[in-house]
Amino acid sequence: MAEQETISVSIFDKSFKVSCPPDEVQALRDSAHYLDKKMREVKSARTVMGLDRIAVMAALNIANELLTANKQRD
């Protein structure tokens, strides 16, 4: 099995321990930071919303960004 490194990332003020290959640590940290930013954007745009809904809305926004970028490349 390939070597894994366990790191702690903070997303929306919650800490998560995640394992990944050592050469992917920075990408994982960047991804966690990006998700945290997107969740905070969703939260600031609405007054009252539960954490699960914030996470789903952020995921939908990120998926839309990815699909739009893929279409523009094609």
Regions found by a protein language model. Give the residues of each.
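N-terminal intrinsically disordered, cationic/polar leader segments
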Residues: 1-2, 6
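Solvent-exposed alpha-helical segments within well-ordered globular domains of core cellular machineries
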Residues: 7, 26-33, 37-40, 61
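Amphipathic, hydrophobic secondary-structure cores in small proteins
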Residues: 15-17, 26, 38, 45-58
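Short small-residue beta-strand/loop micro-motif enriched in glycine and branched aliphatics
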Residues: 16-19, 68-70
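Alpha-helical coiled-coil heptad-repeat segments used for dimerization/assembly
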Residues: 30, 37, 44, 64, ...
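Long, hydrophobic or amphipathic alpha-helical segments
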Residues: 52-55, 59-73
